[in-house]
């Protein structure tokens, strides 16, 4: 499974591609950070991020795009910019029919380091070790993008099993409600 991991941000947006093999085998394909100047208009910054995402998707052909979920930050303005950057990346993937999965920072940290409260240095060290890289990816946004891709490779089987279980439960509920409606209808005759 080829995964494009994206650590969204307006100033620095990390992109990392890995191929996931059997078990926990992951192979690095590419990593980079797209920067946008703070003095550009918001729309121009988002356009640059969108164009970069489209380029990465077209070049690397991922089967899924994994994006960091923004759930809260102390700085509302930063959180909004991060969410907007993630949104344009998700849109670029959706336009190409590629599924998008969002993972929280604690899910990514737990998957890669074993601790949901790991710091950036621990995440970078584990990404470097897992991918057998000669040097740590820099800046941290690059390492985070690779961590997102690794996280998705490792969590995808569980996510698929849960989706199947939820679909089966929904179908069972639908059949039960249909049967219940039949019984009620027969009882009113």
Curated annotation (Swiss-Prot):
Record keywords: Cytoplasm, DNA damage, DNA recombination, DNA repair, DNA-binding, Endonuclease, Hydrolase, Magnesium, Metal-binding, Nuclease
SUPFAM superfamilies for this protein: Ribonuclease H-like
GO biological process: DNA recombination; DNA repair
Cellular-component GO terms for this entry: cytoplasm; Holliday junction resolvase complex
Residue stretches in coiled coil: none
Enzyme Commission numbers on file: 3.1.21.10
Record note on quaternary structure: Homodimer which binds Holliday junction (HJ) DNA. The HJ becomes 2-fold symmetrical on binding to RuvC with unstacked arms; it has a different conformation from HJ DNA in complex with RuvA. In the full resolvosome a probable DNA-RuvA(4)-RuvB(12)-RuvC(2) complex forms which resolves the HJ.
Function description: The RuvA-RuvB-RuvC complex processes Holliday junction (HJ) DNA during genetic recombination and DNA repair. Endonuclease that resolves HJ intermediates. Cleaves cruciform DNA by making single-stranded nicks across the HJ at symmetrical positions within the homologous arms, yielding a 5'-phosphate and a 3'-hydroxyl group; requires a central core of homology in the junction. The consensus cleavage sequence is 5'-(A/T)TT(C/G)-3'. Cleavage occurs on the 3'-side of the TT dinucleotide at the point of strand exchange.
Annotated protein name in UniProt: Crossover junction endodeoxyribonuclease RuvC
Organism from which the protein derives: Rhodococcus jostii (strain RHA1)
């Amino acid at each position: 499974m080829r995964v494009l991991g994206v650590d969204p941000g307006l100033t620095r947006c990390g992109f990392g591609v890995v191929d996931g093999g059997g078990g926990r085998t992951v192979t690095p394909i590419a990593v980079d950070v797209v920067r946008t100047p703070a003095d550009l208009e918001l729309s121009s910054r988002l356009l640059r991020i969108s164009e970069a995402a489209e380029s990465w998707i077209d070049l690397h052909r991922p089967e899924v795009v994994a994006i960091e979920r923004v759930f809260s930050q102390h700085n509302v303005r930063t959180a909004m910019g991060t969410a907007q950057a993630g949104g344009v990346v998700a849109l670029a993937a959706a336009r190409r029919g590629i599924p998008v999965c969002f993972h929280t920072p604690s899910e990514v940290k737990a998957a890669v380091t074993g601790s949901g409260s790991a710091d950036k240095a621990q995440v970078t060290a584990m990404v470097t070790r897992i991918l057998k890289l000669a040097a740590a990816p820099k800046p941290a946004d690059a390492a985070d993008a690779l961590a997102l891709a690794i996280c998705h490779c490792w969590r995808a089987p569980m996510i698929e099993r849960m989706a199947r279980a939820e679909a089966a439960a929904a179908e069972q509920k639908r059949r039960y409600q249909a049967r219940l409606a039949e019984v009620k209808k027969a009882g009113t005759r």
